[in-house]
Amino acid sequence: MSSFLVSSNNLPEREIPGDYGFPIISAIKDRYDYFYKQGEDVWFHSKAEKYNSTVVKINMAPGPFTSNDYKLVAFLDANSFVYMFDNSLIDKTDTLGGTFKPGKEYYGGYRPVAFVDTSDPNHAALKNYILTSFAKRHNLFIPLFRNSVSDHLFQNLEKQVSDQGKSDFNALLPNMTFGFIFRLLCDQTNPSDTVLGAQGPEHLRKWLFPQLIPSLSARKLPSFIEDLLFHNFLIPFGLVKSDYNKLVDAFSKNAGSMLDEAEKLGIKREEAVHNILFLVGINMFAGLNAFFPHLIRFVGEAGPTLHARLAKEIRTAIKEEGGAVTLSAINKMSLVESIVYETLRLRPPVPLQYGKAKKDFMVQSHDASYMIKKGQFLVGYQPMASRDPKIFDKPDDFIPDRFMGEGVKMLKHVLWSNGRETENPAPDNKQCAGKDLVHLLGRLMLVEFFLRYDTFTVEITPLFRAPNVAIKTLTKAT
């Protein structure tokens, strides 16, 4: 039995409930409900409520006509969801994006490691390469990120709040995150000094758009137009080829040490470049730009009482380190740490995990056992798993100190990284290679905020997944 799973021999076996409905028509109706009428959260909850089960058959968006394989079984509670982490049961080959997959031309003819199952010998080599590359650069994480938020975020926040009465936090993130990532992986080269100029984030967003939009709603067009354009057909790579080629050129010329490291591990430089770009685009750029708005939203909405606690904890820890922002100081900040975990629990950057059954197996929810047949396409919806009321008290509430003190025992139920928070990424698993980096950067974001400000207020505009956060006021540190 996998260490991920908690099983019981006393649960009754049930047939998997649910109904795929009429071919194509029912799937399109489900797609409209998922994207436009209900939204992702309500849609998944409605399926569980309708069939009184957290293991249920669904038509998974986007469905027709981007994919012919959209009849899935969904795992919607903490107990069933963790089966998605068991590499002996779940095949992750080409399932990262769900029921559709972008062509290999998006990645230079290669399949990045995220699309490769652990049973493929290439997986361990590529995952080890990424892990060792991060390890060799760990001393750069704090200084490079601090420089990036200082240069690209806070100066602009303050100016916009002063001049315009508010600042669009989300709009300022791409330049900051891209600059940090590029300097981290490209020997501290400033992206504006390369062929990319100031357009690096824009090239990256254009390349990412056709890969992500089939599973999202931009909410910028009438629903029927958006659905027709983006959920029925995959966008041809040719439309973004020039953007991708500029990114390849920039990283090929400036990520010299990372490419040298790849060659020493037996990985071709060309393959390494395309894996680096996937890491940069999907794992880091898209992930951080989804995570940070939720973090600032939750903290901003919590108000001045929490802000005072954070400011005191952060400034005290920094003072004890002689005024330096060090990893040692950050590790003393238990409230900051808990808030980052709580944000990742409530709003994981990647909410859906996909895979196909490698063999017949029994999956258990809290209430029953279900037979999964070999080849069945599966999806786990993480926000329901990590807000499972049978695991967490007040599961939908943002509780800043949830993971302080005895609360650290609940970290095994924080699942955002494609693994338990108590587990670590390794060459033989699919857990996010940047797990520890994301957590560090979340803490650093709060440290930088509350070294500068005593409190702030926010205005929130809901979007399909990440909210748009406007900073309304900033009260400088006293």
Swiss-Prot record:
Major location (coarse): cytoplasm
Entry-linked CDD domains: CYP74
Major enzyme class: lyase
Record: residues binding heme: 432
Pfam families found in the cross-reference section: p450
Gene Ontology, cellular component aspect: cytosol
Entry function: Strictly inducible cytochrome P450 involved in the biosynthesis of the anti-fungal toxins colneleate and colnelenate. Can use (9S)-hydroperoxy-(10E,12Z)-octadecadienoate (9-HPOD) and (9S)-hydroperoxy-(10E,12Z,15Z)-octadecatrienoate (9-HPOT) as substrates, but has a very low activity with the corresponding 13-hydroperoxides (13-HPOD and 13-POT).
Name by which UniProt lists this protein: Divinyl ether synthase CYP74D3
